[in-house]
Regions:
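Basic/aromatic-enriched alpha-helical hairpins
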Residues: 26, 76-153, 172
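Short, basic (Lys/Arg/His-rich) helix/loop patches that form interaction surfaces
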Residues: 148, 213, 217-218, 230, ...
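Conserved tyrosine-mediated DNA breakage-rejoining catalytic core shared by Y-recombinases
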Residues: 13, 206, 240-317
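Basic, Lys/Arg- and aromatic-enriched nucleic-acid-binding interface segment
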Residues: 148, 153-159, 163-165, 178, ...
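DNA/chromatin major-groove-contacting recognition/catalytic segments
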Residues: 206, 210-211, 263-266, 394, ...
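Short functional hotspots where side chains directly engage DNA or cofactors
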Residues: 123, 188-189, 249-254, 358, ...
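Short, charged hinge/linker segments at domain and secondary-structure junctions
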Residues: 59-71, 126-130, 174-196, 409-410
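Short, Arg/Lys-rich segments that mark the N-terminal edge of DNA/RNA- and chromatin-recognition modules
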Residues: 1-38, 262-263
Length: 410
């Protein structure tokens, strides 16, 4: 071995080959971890030549060429270690200026559930794809944890929820990758779980009649008639004001939404903001009935948080639907909350003896009835606040094929 010929910059170190070169004015050595053979000496010499050429050309990426080199830290190129918990705190803090409070709350909830599963004290760089596969399995099939740390009797989560959790955390790990905390995102190549396409479950005409008859107050009837005959989102429904309605023109302009966090915001999508809903006669009749109860009510100034960080607007609102109509005023606010709308829906279904559905089916009922009546999908999309008709086709395509020729006109 002592008589072996070595290319310039190639040397034997403990039976293995290493190369040396100058980088940033310093002589550095890199172990190649290959045995000292004639063939390997030739390859090592070629590698060293290419490294020196890249350095001269200013295109040498030390971390890419030698990702595990102990020399990286001497040049400030090493991985920046951070724990999963510290990463989540940093990521959320930076996300605050990008997303609305409602979205931030969802992210915080995801991280609260995921941190114990990932290991909050583990280094981000140590998380592997195998770790993530086990986390995903536990999310889907394991028992959920309560806020007090105890295990609940609720087992598993839906595929939709699991995919949302994983996608959210994947974004956090991409942030880590982009900023040098890990050499690669372990979520790369991890496909979402397959999910079945859930068909809409609208109320039939007969069910809707039974539903309305089971309402205990005229305001409740008016609210659900308007919801079903407009397809309005429930956050938009509870924040609807008489200032948004033109009964003569038979239109509603959607200007705001009300979130679970108790904030007024613009509607969910840009396409849904400021959209005009054209009212059919049942909706007009419901609003005329409701006008007798609330149109002359107190006008409130509400702060609406805009999409641009830190910006707000003030809207003057005489709310169309008010819990003060049916309850003692001192115990109620000027408008409903979204959760109370859902509770109302569930209670009415029970009283009417109808099969349980989620309250969002009021929106599906509008779309399905409209399609059954031959309405243009693009028109329906604009009424519901979708960007284009593709969403209508995606969600209601299968249902459209099942519509009977005997469907009643809308």
């Amino acid at each position: 071995m002592s008589n072996a010929s070595y290319p310039t910059g190639v040397e034997n170190h403990g039976g293995s080959l290493r190369i040396w070169f100058h980088y940033n004015g310093k002589r550095v050595r890199e172990n190649l971890g290959v045995p000292d053979t004639a063939k390997n000496r030739k390859i090592a010499g070629e590698l060293r030549t290419s490294v020196c050429f890249a350095i001269r050309m200013g295109s040498f990426d030390y971390a890419a060429q030698f990702p595990n080199s102990p020399n990286l830290k001497h040049f400030g190129l090493g991985k920046r270690e951070i724990t999963v918990k510290a990463l989540s705190e940093k990521w959320l803090d930076l996300k605050k200026i990008e997303i609305c409070a409602n979205a931030l709350n969802r992210y915080q909830s995801v991280i609260k559930n995921m941190l114990p599963m990932l290991g909050e004290k583990k280094l981000v760089s140590s998380i592997t794809k195998e770790d993530l596969l086990f986390v995903r399995r536990d999310l889907l099939t394991g028992y959920q944890k309560l806020s007090n740390g105890k295990t609940s009797s609720i087992k598993g989560r839906s595929v939709v929820t699991v995919n949302y959790y994983m996608t959210t955390i994947a974004g956090m790990f991409q942030f880590a990758t982009d900023n040098g905390y890990t050499s690669g995102n372990p979520f790369n190549g991890l496909a979402p779980l397959k999910k079945s396409k859930v068909k809409p479950d609208p109320l039939t005409r007969d069910e809707f009649i039974r539903f309305i008859e089971a309402c205990r107050h005229q305001q409740t009837k008016n609210l659900w008639i308007l919801a079903v005959y407009t397809g309005i989102r429930h956050g938009e429904l509870v924040s609807l004001a008489w200032e948004d309605i033109d009964l003569k023109a038979r239109t509603i302009t959607i200007r705001r939404n009300y979130t679970k966090l108790g904030e007024f915001t613009p509607p969910k999508t840009d396409a849904g903001t400021g959209r005009t809903i054209h009212l059919v006669q049942p909706a007009i009749d419901a609003l005329k009935s409701q006008a007798e109860m609330t149109m002359l009510g107190k006008q409130h100034s509400v702060e609406v948080k805009q999409r641009e960080y830190g910006r707000t607007a003030v809207h003057k609102c005489t709310f169309v639907f008010s819990p003060q109509v049916t309850k003692q005023q001192q115990l109620s606010g000027p408008h409903y909350k979204v959760d109370s709308i859902r509770e109302s829906w569930t209670s009415i279904l029970k009283r009417a003896g109808l099969r349980h559905r989620k309250s969002y089916q009021s929106r599906h009922t509008y779309a399905c009835w409209s399609l059954a009546a031959g309405a243009n999908p693009s028109f329906i999309a604009s009424q519901m606040g979708h960007t284009n008709a593709q969403m209508v086709f995606n969600v209601y395509g299968a249902w459209m094929k099942d519509v009977s020729d005997s469907s009643e006109p809308y």
